[in-house]
Amino acid sequence: MGIKYSSKINKIRTFALSLIFVGFIVMYIGIFFRTSPFVMTLFMILGLLFIIASTVVYFWIGTLSTRAVKVVCPSCGKITKMLGKVDLCMFCNEPLTLDPELEGKEFDEKYNRKKRKS
């Protein structure tokens, strides 16, 4: 079975959402240390930092999303946003590319990495 790919924007949004849940879990763990105010406060502040990090990631992906190229997916016909040379449709996971040299090739996220000249 092949690698499960997802669009880059959706991956970053999922990461930001997971930061929120981690923050809540860390804060919840802090409640178990009610007898030690210092440890409880430490866990609460750490959880808050996870939630603030999530806010920063959401803000960053929002600004990145406004600069993304909008294309119409040939498979489902919906407008999707692309980051980089190759990406997947956000709705149907159809491989998309803006580079004519990559058309017809097997989808690989490595095409987005810049090659170093040696």
UniProtKB/Swiss-Prot annotation:
It is a multi-pass membrane protein. InterPro entries: UPF0295. GO terms for cellular component: plasma membrane. Keywords: Cell membrane, Membrane, Transmembrane, Transmembrane helix. It is found in: Cell membrane. Belongs to the UPF0295 family. This is UPF0295 protein GWCH70_0499. It comes from Geobacillus sp. (strain WCH70).
